[in-house]
């Protein structure tokens, strides 16, 4: 099945904040982070069922190299994948449920 991927506005903020943080630590590291996230978005788009449901119909794809999970939901009725957020794995999981 072919899906369309939709990003909630907060996803862009998550990526920008994390990019800025990594760049403040090591020049160019933020760019590497963004590249890893984009690659994971491609995997989600082409193989969303690869990731199991973790909570409230939400699946989590973990990035390689960086400790982040991409939280998304598959909407079968519209053939859409909605990316809800990008969270550091050490953050309080209660934050996930608030979005």
State each model region's role.
Residues 73-99:
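Enriched for short, Lys/Arg-rich terminal
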Residues 1-34:
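Arg/Lys-rich, positively charged N-terminal/basic patches that mediate binding to nucleic acids
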Residues 1-4, 58, 80, 98-99:
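Small, basic N-terminal interaction modules of short regulatory proteins
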Residues 14, 40-43, 60, 85:
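Residue-level recognition of specific faces of alpha-helices
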Residues 20, 27, 42, 46-49, ...:
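Generic structural signal for secondary-structure transition and capping sites
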Residues 39, 46-80:
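Basic/aromatic recognition patch in beta-strand/loop cores that engages polyanionic ligands
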Residues 31, 52-54, 95:
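Short, hydrophobic secondary-structure boundary micro-motifs
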Residues 12, 38, 89-90:
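Alpha-helix N-cap/helix-start and coil->helix boundary motif
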């Amino acid at each position: 099945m072919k899906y369309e991927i939709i990003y909630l506005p907060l996803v862009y903020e998550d990526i920008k904040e994390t990019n800025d943080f990594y760049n403040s630590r090591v020049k160019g590291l933020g760019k590497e982070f963004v590249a890893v996230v984009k690659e994971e978005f491609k995997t989600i788009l082409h193989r969303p069922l690869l990731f199991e449901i973790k909570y409230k119909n939400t699946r989590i794809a973990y990035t390689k190299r960086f400790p982040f999970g991409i939280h998304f939901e598959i909407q079968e009725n519209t053939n859409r994948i909605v990316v809800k957020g990008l969270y550091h794995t050490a953050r309080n999981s209660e934050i996930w449920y608030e979005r």
